[in-house]
Regions:
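N-terminal export signals
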Residues: 1-2, 6-27
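Beta-strand cores of secreted/periplasmic/IMS beta-sandwich domains, seen most often
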Residues: 51-74, 95-102, 106-109
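N-terminal post-signal-peptidase region of extra-cytosolic proteins
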Residues: 43-53
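Extracytoplasmic/periplasmic copper-protein system
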Residues: 28-42, 116-162
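Copper-binding active sites and cupredoxin-like electron-transfer domains
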Residues: 2, 71-79, 141, 159-162
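Histidine- and aromatic-enriched segments that form or immediately flank copper-ligand environments
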Residues: 66-91, 120
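C-terminal segment of N-terminal export signals and the immediately downstream linker at the start
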Residues: 22-40, 84-86, 92
Length: 162
């Protein structure tokens, strides 16, 4: 998927909003929604997607996976987690809340649709400990170009924070 100006503004706005919150508001943990969809809302040709497929959060925030379409779930990639983080696997067709306290980058996928490239990335706090390593993890089938695109947008997002 090509990154549009609208995508850049969305990423920038989400990042700015999370950093401008008073520390007390962040301490309670914000909720970030990720929809599990059969079709990308802006490109119906793009099938089996998490939307958004990259999320920037603070430690203690919750990522809420919404089963907007049936037959999807969220599962951690064990080889794409920060040290000390716990893996997860949600039930297919169910909403799922994931609260993240360990800083770093988290790769995940939809169990039935991994081969379709239904993958995503969560960036929690300081990701310098494992972000670059995650880029080198071997990807297969349609997951490879999707993760390449996600990491390109992640690079842009992180560069904007520097």
């Amino acid at each position: 998927m090509k990154l549009t100006g609208r995508d850049h503004l969305t990423l920038l706005g989400a990042t700015a909003a999370s950093t401008l919150l008073p520390s007390g508001a962040r301490a309670n943990g914000a909720v970030h929604e990720v929809k599990m969809l059969n079709h990308h809302p802006d490109d119906k040709k793009e099938l089996m997607v998490f939307y958004p497929d990259i999320v920037r959060v603070s430690p203690g925030d919750t990522v809420r996976f919404l089963a907007a379409d049936n037959n999807h779930n969220s599962q951690a990639r064990n080889d794409m987690l920060p040290e000390g983080a716990e893996a997860w696997k949600s039930k297919i067709g169910s909403d799922f809340d994931l609260t993240l306290d360990v800083e770093g980058a988290y790769g995940y996928f939809c169990t039935p649709h991994k081969s379709y490239g239904m993958v995503g990335l969560i960036l929690v706090g300081d990701v310098s400990g494992n972000y670059e390593t995650l880029k080198t993890v071997r990807q297969r089938s349609k997951s490879k170009p999707r993760f390449e695109d996600i990491f390109a947008r992640g690079d842009w997002l992180l560069a904007g924070e520097a």
